[in-house]
A protein has these predicted regions:
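Canonical Rossmann dinucleotide-binding motif of NAD(H)/NADP(H)-dependent dehydrogenases/reductases
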Residues: 3-34
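Alpha-helical segment proximal to the catalytic Tyr-Lys
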Residues: 129, 172-177, 233
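Residue(s) in the substrate-gating loop at a strand-loop-helix junction
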Residues: 144
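A glycine/serine/threonine-rich, flexible loop-to-helix segment
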Residues: 156, 186-209, 219
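Short C-terminal tail/terminal secondary-structure segment
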Residues: 95-98, 149, 207, 225, ...
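Substrate-binding pocket helix/loop in short-chain dehydrogenase/reductase
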Residues: 99-101, 105-110, 139, 194, ...
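Active-site helix of classical SDR
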Residues: 124, 160, 168
Length: 249
């Protein structure tokens, strides 16, 4: 994905991991991009440097996705560097600890809801006023195929992502035709977080899908580029899930 497909677009991508791949794909296609991070400034700076290699303007900003004051400061900074925006990718999220429902603490439940649900709410609430009134805006919410498939011992995570899906549908009705809102729901994707945090046995089990492999971050970034581009202007309220057939298992 290179060229000028997104030339002139100003995009905001929250969170890292898949968000890094999305941000770099946007930059390759000519977009100016701002990314957010919580703690790893060095990694964010590396991503900015990678994006700048494509001759675009790139920025990073520290923002805790579930913190309202942080999000207000993010909006102020975006207004300062971009003026207005065209694309928001709500990617920041947390998976949570694997545990049966009887062992999920209230604090852990609240933590996941704060990041995965409230984070989408806050970014959308405070960044909507920044969308360019003369262009069709795009909001892309990153969910998970587990939001429809379910997963034992991850009720907090699947519930949070199910809420994101519902928010997408309501926002699509509320904001169209000026801003188009869609969900991208990845299946099992090979990310640094997965490879570092999960056992090799878990990773191998995740490959037990019709395509027989984990997806790549490129499989996800390609869809987000489509939705962010001029070719995504008849998508509204959609649930798009690159998952290698995982939903059938």
């Amino acid at each position: 994905m290179k060229g000028d497909l997104l030339k002139g677009s100003r995009c905001v991508v929250t969170g890292a991991s898949i968000g890094k791949a999305i941000a770099e794909a946007f930059a390759k296609c000519g977009a100016d991009v701002l990314i957010t991070y919580v703690s790893n400034k060095a990694k964010a700076d590396e991503t900015v440097a990678e994006m700048e290699k494509y001759g675009v303007n790139a920025y990073s900003f520290r923002c805790d996705a579930g913190d309202e004051e942080d999000t207000k400061r993010l909006a102020d900074y975006i207004k300062e560097v971009f003026g207005s925006i065209d694309v928001l990718v709500n990617n920041a999220g947390a998976i949570g600890e694997e545990a049966p429902i009887t062992q999920i603490t209230s604090d852990e439940w609240d933590r996941i809801m704060r990041v995965d649900v409230k984070g989408v709410f806050l970014a959308t609430k405070y960044l909507i006023p920044l969308f360019d009134k003369e262009r069709t805006g795009k909001i892309i919410n990153i969910s998970s195929e587990l939001s429809v498939k379910g997963r034992a011992n991850y009720t907090h995570y699947t519930a949070a992502k199910g809420a994101v899906n519902a928010m997408t549908r309501s926002l699509a009705l509320e904001l169209a035709p000026h801003i188009l809102v869609n969900t991208v729901a990845p299946g099992p994707i090979e990310t640094d977080m997965i490879l570092q945090d999960m056992s090799s046995e878990w990773v191998e089990k995740e490959k037990n899908i019709p395509l027989g492999r984990l997806g790549s971050v490129t499989d996800i970034s390609a869809v987000t580029v489509l939705l962010a581009s001029k070719y995504g202007e008849f998508y509204c309220g959609q649930f798009i899930s690159p998952n290698g057939g995982a939903v059938f298992i």
